[in-house]
UniProtKB/Swiss-Prot annotation:
It comes from Galium corsicum. The modification N6,N6,N6-trimethyllysine is found at residue 14. It is an enzyme of class 4 (lyase). Keywords: Acetylation, Calvin cycle, Carbon dioxide fixation, Chloroplast, Disulfide bond, Lyase, Magnesium, Metal-binding, Methylation, Monooxygenase, Oxidoreductase, Photorespiration, Photosynthesis, Plastid. This is Ribulose bisphosphate carboxylase large chain. Its main location: plastid. It catalyses: 2 (2R)-3-phosphoglycerate + 2 H(+) = D-ribulose 1,5-bisphosphate + CO2 + H2O; D-ribulose 1,5-bisphosphate + O2 = 2-phosphoglycolate + (2R)-3-phosphoglycerate + 2 H(+). The gene is rbcL. Its cofactor is Mg(2+). The record marks 334 as: Transition state stabilizer.
């Protein structure tokens, strides 16, 4: 039975429940170079046609609501509406399909990841006509990319600042993550940097707690950096976590880091928020600080296979919002990561131009034009025996971040750092000599053990 409608006197206006596909499903539409394109994995409620559900996603994430409203006549829906322009099945999943949606660029505020996500994913994921919804990928048009500053410095500028070339960078997260005093924390930082690491790191939940206030930590870490630099002749850094309860406090911590003369600060970009992250990124570029990004909370958003957002979308958003490093998974180690899929979004972080490649999860060709690249950080559950695989998989433009793989060395922190550095240099040397790291990795590490703790 058709829904009841009410006619407004004199204007011929009809209210009532409308099928979304009548307005928002447009398979004949040819996408524009300026459109933001989205690929959604849709799991509809039983009995609902794919065209209607795909159109509903386009409508509820752009101009639509459940009925026609009289103010529709005061604007041009054809100019501003999102369009579901293509639907394809998901192989092996009878109840799922991919809906491709095109959004006009005028729907989004320039230079605002916050506004982009508020529009595309802010409301539609709670739509009861859908059992589940996942944003698999976005195509960001060049016209929109150019409204963002992006990373504060990028890969090449970071290497020039550090004067380190031809190999991955080495890092270590200080453990235990919580409970150390600032002085003992600084001691661990010094031992790791003195042993040969390029960076050490605050854990994501180290902010300013009663056992270690942020200012004390910054001071002792700066002392460790300068002492290790003087003794090794290398430029060193520690990711000082500036994440705070307010943007004002976050910037205050970054200002203090700059006054100490340290090279890099850190931010938890998902828990801190994109507005805060973009603000910090702008400050870092203006003041010569590198910015390390941790993705704490990402698995809440990206781990479910049929609901939420894939990490490649969060990675693209970070490149737009700004960060010089971001944690990206390891493929090896204790956290999840499929090799081809992980390398797909690693390339989206580093490269200027990435072709569509569905085998790697890349739904759209992405052109970043002149936006600087981001170094992927491989971390969590890795140690020296993973070094050949990590060197082969991630290449030179990466940060290999060890925690227990450094601090868990039976001889102490400094020998653990020495072991990491010796293993890395052995793998890079073997690779440059043409040896196969995949098949000879164990032998390469055993040879290196003769010259390392």
């Amino acid at each position: 039975m058709s829904p009841q409608t009410e006619t407004k006197a004199g204007v011929g206006f009809k209210a009532g429940v409308k099928e979304y596909k009548l307005t928002y499903y447009t398979p004949e539409y040819e996408t524009k170079d300026t459109d933001i394109l989205a690929a959604f994995r849709v799991t509809p409620q039983p009995g609902v046609p794919p065209e209607e559900r795909g159109a509903a996603v386009a409508a509820e994430s752009s101009t639509g609501t459940w009925t026609t409203v009289w103010t529709d006549g005061l604007t041009s829906l054809d100019r501003y509406k999102g369009r579901c322009y293509h639907i394809e099945p998901v192989p092996g999943e009878e109840d799922q399909f991919i809906a491709y949606v095109a959004y006009p660029l005028d729907l989004f505020e320039e230079g605002s990841v916050t506004n982009m996500f508020t529009s595309i994913v802010g409301n539609v994921f709670g739509f009861k006509a859908l059992r589940a919804l996942r944003l698999e990928d976005l195509r960001i048009p060049v016209a929109y990319v150019k409204t963002f500053q992006g990373p504060p410095h990028g890969i090449q500028v970071e290497r020039d600042k550090l004067n380190k070339y031809g190999r991955p960078l080495l890092g270590c997260t200080i453990k235990p993550k919580l409970g150390l005093s600032a002085k003992n924390y600084g001691r661990a930082v010094y031992e790791c940097l003195r042993g040969g690491l390029d960076f050490t790191k605050d854990d994501e939940n180290v902010n300013s707690q009663p056992f270690m206030r942020w200012r004390d930590r910054f001071l002792f870490c700066a002392e460790a950096i300068y002492k290790s630099q003087a003794e090794t002749g290398e430029i060193k850094g520690h990711y000082l976590n500036a994440t705070a309860g307010t943007c004002e406090e976050m910037i205050k911590r970054a200002v203090f880091a700059r006054e100490l003369g340290v090279p890099i600060v850190m931010h938890d970009y998902l828990t801190g928020g994109f507005t805060a992250n973009t603000s910090l990124s702008h400050y870092c570029r203006d003041n010569g600080l590198l910015l390390h990004i941790h993705r704490a909370m990402h698995a809440v958003i990206d781990r479910q296979k049929n609901h939420g957002m894939h990490f490649r979308v969060l990675a693209k958003a970070l490149r737009m919002s700004g960060g010089d490093h971001i944690h990206s998974g390891t493929v090896v180690g204790k956290l999840e990561g499929e090799r081809d899929i992980t390398l797909g979004f690693v390339d989206l972080l580093r490269d200027d131009y990435i072709e569509k490649d569905r085998s790697r999860g890349i739904y759209f060709t992405q052109d970043w034009v002149s936006l600087p690249g981001v170094l992927p950080v491989a971390s969590r559950g890795i140690h020296v025996w993973h070094m050949p695989a990590l060197t082969e998989i991630f290449g030179d433009d990466s940060v290999l971040q060890f925690g227990g793989g450094t601090l868990g060395h039976p001889w102490g922190n400094a020998p653990g750092a020495v072991a990491n550095r010796v293993a890395l240099e052995a793998c890079v040397k073997a690779r440059n000599e043409g040896r196969d790291l995949a098949s000879e990795g164990g032998e390469i590490i055993r040879e290196a053990c003769k010259w390392s703790p």
